[in-house]
């Protein structure tokens, strides 16, 4: 398989790291090696890599904040979107955001440009691509709220737009398969005063500081809330708050966080 990866490397400009220790790129700092790890800096390179999908598996990652790698590692290529997918642009009433942009950086950009309703992203670890796939959200807001459409590429190298309705966005879910890679997203722009945006952002910050283990690197809430219930409350009722197994434990601050 290394010979195949070397063949792919010869056709792209982005560097592939062989036998990559995934502990370096996940917040849990656990798991085995991937056959290869590449930070892709162009659509051209991305197309080349996925053109070999019938010969080698691939998996797209963001910053590894919501990723657990098994001890046996991953028998394929881990792909991370690089700097050319980390751009944010404003075009009239549309905010175009690269899939590799950090959620927190989108929140900062929105504040700097007096664009409201992106404050909740300041409390979500991860990238916009991942936020779209799981319809990430918190404190009454979610990624779907202002989303208009996304640009994706499939394993055949075809690029197309998908509208918000086509994604069937629901509570922490979408119909996006692993076969589709999100390249960018277009959001609606709604303007407000900086003071109003800062007030909402500070409210979210205070809520997080008072109820979440923010001093630890976590993947956020681990389990979805079932209808009419809170996962954290159910975990506490089961007597699992503070439970430990090796170096992992259920947070005593918020039972739905694993640290």
Regions found by a protein language model. Give the residues of each.
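Solvent-exposed alpha-helices and their adjacent loops that cap or buttress functional pockets
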Residues: 28-31, 60-61, 68-72, 88-90, ...
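A gly/ser-rich beta-alpha-beta helix-loop segment of oxidoreductase catalytic cores
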Residues: 117-148, 218, 222
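Conserved beta-strand segments that form the floor/walls of ligand-binding pockets within enzyme
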Residues: 29, 96, 119, 133, ...
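Contiguous, small/hydrophobic- and glycine-enriched helical/loop subdomains that border
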Residues: 90-94, 98-104, 117, 123, ...
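Phosphate/pyrophosphate- and phosphate-bearing ligand-binding catalytic cores of soluble enzymes
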Residues: 17-18, 24, 153-259
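Short capping/connector residues at structural and topological boundaries
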Residues: 27-35, 72-74, 79, 129, ...
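Anion-binding (especially nucleotide phosphate/pyrophosphate-binding) glycine-rich loop
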Residues: 1-128
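Structural signature of FAD isoalloxazine-binding scaffolds in flavoprotein oxidoreductases
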Residues: 38-43, 68-86, 133-164, 177-184
């Amino acid at each position: 398989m290394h010979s195949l990866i070397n063949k792919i490397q010869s056709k792209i400009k982005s560097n592939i790291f062989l036998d990559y220790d995934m502990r370096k790129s996940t917040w849990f700092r656990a798991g085995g090696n991937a056959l290869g790890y590449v930070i892709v800096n162009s659509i051209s390179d991305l197309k080349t890599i996925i053109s070999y999908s019938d010969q080698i598996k691939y998996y797209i990652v963001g910053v590894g904040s919501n990723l657990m790698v098994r001890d046996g590692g991953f028998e394929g290529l881990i792909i991370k979107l690089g700097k050319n997918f980390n751009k944010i642009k404003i075009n009239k009433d549309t905010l175009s955001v690269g899939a590799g942009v950090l959620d927190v950086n989108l929140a900062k950009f929105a504040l700097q440009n007096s664009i409201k309703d992106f404050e909740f992203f300041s409390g979500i670890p991860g990238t916009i691509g991942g936020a779209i796939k799981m319809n990430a959200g918190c404190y009454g807001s979610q990624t779907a709220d202002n989303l208009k459409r996304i640009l994706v590429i499939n394993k055949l190298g075809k690029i197309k737009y998908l509208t918000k309705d086509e994604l069937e966005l629901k509570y922490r879910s979408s119909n996006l398969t692993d076969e589709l890679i999100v390249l960018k997203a277009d959001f609606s722009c709604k303007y407000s005063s900086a003071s109003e945006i800062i007030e909402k952002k500070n409210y979210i910050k205070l809520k997080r500081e008072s109820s979440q283990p923010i001093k630890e690197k976590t993947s956020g809430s681990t389990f979805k809330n079932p209808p009419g219930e809170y996962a954290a409350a159910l975990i506490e009722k089961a007597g699992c708050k503070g439970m430990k197994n090796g170096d992992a434990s259920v947070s005593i601050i918020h039972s739905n966080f694993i640290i």
